[in-house]
């Protein structure tokens, strides 16, 4: 059963009961997933930017937006308009497919994985996790990568508090660390 179908049929009613909500539309849901990668030192290298864009496109199955510097910062050796990273925003079916792959395939492939930190919520029910290496995703083949690069994954929810967001992600199967 797909994650979207499971959310509608089992997770939503269970959360409504657990959080004692009167209306089904009050139940927290995932709005979007943003996958972001800052290039850092590699920003000057066009080849690493292209490799980054291609990897994110393979992982998410969607076109990648190159993020550019808003203003020049001499200390970081960047000029205005220089490419400094890339990002993808996933919504709808692609978002649920990505979350399912992340939870069931990618996270268990992390070395010495004991669960994701339950403290990475922002106070409004949104969750951010950092991934250190892109090879945990099955779409990326180890032989074709030129460098190990990480990424930030932000899961934006309609939850009003961290507890609601944590309950939603736990029901979806997110493996949180047990203290």
Curated annotation (Swiss-Prot):
UniProt subunit comment: Part of the 50S ribosomal subunit; part of the 5S rRNA/L5/L18/L25 subcomplex. Contacts the 5S rRNA and the P site tRNA. Forms a bridge to the 30S subunit in the 70S ribosome.
This protein's GO CC annotations: ribonucleoprotein complex; ribosome
Entry's family note: Belongs to the universal ribosomal protein uL5 family.
Coiled coil: none
GO biological process, one term: translation
Role according to the record: This is one of the proteins that bind and probably mediate the attachment of the 5S RNA into the large ribosomal subunit, where it forms part of the central protuberance. In the 70S ribosome it contacts protein S13 of the 30S subunit (bridge B1b), connecting the 2 subunits; this bridge is implicated in subunit movement. Contacts the P site tRNA; the 5S rRNA and some of its associated proteins might help stabilize positioning of ribosome-bound tRNAs.
Listed InterPro entries: Ribosomal_uL5, Ribosomal_uL5_bac-type, Ribosomal_uL5_C, Ribosomal_uL5_CS, Ribosomal_uL5_dom_sf, Ribosomal_uL5_N
GO terms for MF: rRNA binding; structural constituent of ribosome; tRNA binding
Keywords linked to the UniProt accession: Ribonucleoprotein, Ribosomal protein, RNA-binding, rRNA-binding, tRNA-binding
Name of protein: Large ribosomal subunit protein uL5
One Pfam family here: Ribosomal_L5_C
